[in-house]
Amino acid sequence: MAALRALCGFRGVAAQVLRPGAGVRLPIQPSRGVRQWQPDVEWAQQFGGAVMYPSKETAHWKPPPWNDVDPPKDTIVKNMTLNFGPQHPAAHGVLRLVMELSGEMVRKCDPHIGLLHRGTEKLIEYKTYLQALPYFDRLDYVSMMCNEQAYSLAVEKLLNIRPPPRAQWIRVLFGEITRLLNHIMAVTTHALDLGAMTPFFWLFEEREKMFEFYERVSGARMHAAYIRPGGVHQDLPLGLMDDIYQFSKNFSLRLDELEELLTNNRIWRNRTIDIGVVTAEEALNYGFSGVMLRGSGIQWDLRKTQPYDVYDQVEFDVPVGSRGDCYDRYLCRVEEMRQSLRIIAQCLNKMPPGEIKVDDAKVSPPKRAEMKTSMESLIHHFKLYTEGYQVPPGATYTAIEAPKGEFGVYLVSDGSSRPYRCKIKAPGFAHLAGLDKMSKGHMLADVVAIIGTQDIVFGEVDR
């Protein structure tokens, strides 16, 4: 205490100290020999002065509630972000969607691609023109021979050659079989995603029969590598055309059964009519092709407008939709399968005899029988399969009407035996870009129907 008095500068009885936290000087009073502070008159006078009254600004303030519970604040409601896929069974491969949902209503749909990217276009630059062919089987792995057909036509255009008539008819025949394969997969898996399981089992049995045709003609069920620059790999085996005829005759009955199940089904119509509507103008602006374009009412089919091989010698109709919704696209695919049966029947009736490869030893390999008797044939065979053939310098863009749309190949040659650049135009890439536009404003369950009607395969989208 003496130190405290010395600090304050007083030696009297009542030294003044500062009360902690008050900023007011307090007297120290002696009591029973112990010095402690007690309030006195002088200390109380320090608090005299004006009294603060509530101003007009604070007069409208409300007192706190009697139970000391704050009233609920206005909460900010945000849309839910949902990751759809890539392991979702309706994602048709490795599709990942980042969707913004308001309840069950889709406000935004952002596709994320690249999960199946394999660098196909770069790998092709390190292969000969023949070795690059199997890569195309693995792009759209549901319509294999159509991819081969586009690449073979591009190489033939650079080489300035034309395959024999029989080879062209075989190409058209298997191109339409491939279209049936693709549309069966598209329609039945679309129905399976929406809850209709029966068409999937019925039509996949027919699909197995067409895989047998693939196997009998090339040795492989899927990745055939059958259509090659200059023609096709080998001729049709005996009895195959008869079996294709029997199959096509029975397949129309399967299509009738499919339509009995789906076309007038109330649930199917409710899930597809006015879902994913695309107008003709929007379809053109997004770069749609194939069924996605024809379903919106635009009659555009490269087999009619820019015929290749012998499509100018066959008769068929191009079905178009009127509303541009999922139901119209379903009807277009079913009718395209019927038109493919018409084309298959014409191919079987008009199939000419003759060679199946171009008669140029520098491009197409010789027959096995000739290699046993001719040294030149053996040399040509060895050079073709080791070094490949040189393609004159140039560039070409060749497109065909694949089952999913316009499948294009932009091929650049520098005069060597390997492509300098091969750019692949996949139809599903543009269709996936329109998914946000098509699904906005629909329910979450309708996104599955829209993905199914787009018929997307990620081998060609990611490449």
Swiss-Prot record:
Recorded catalytic activity of this chain's protein: a ubiquinone + NADH + 5 H(+)(in) = a ubiquinol + NAD(+) + 4 H(+)(out)
Localization in the cell: Mitochondrion inner membrane
Major subcellular location class: mitochondrion
One GO process term, biological-process aspect: neurogenesis
Organism: Pan troglodytes (Chimpanzee)
Membrane topology recorded in Swiss-Prot or TrEMBL: Peripheral membrane protein
Superkingdom to which the source organism belongs: Eukaryota
Protein name, entry field: NADH dehydrogenase [ubiquinone] iron-sulfur protein 2, mitochondrial
Subunit annotation: Core subunit of respiratory chain NADH dehydrogenase (Complex I) which is composed of 45 different subunits. Component of the iron-sulfur (IP) fragment of the enzyme. Interacts with NDUFAF3. Interacts with NDUFAF7. Interacts with CERS2.
Gene: NDUFS2
Leader sequence segment: none
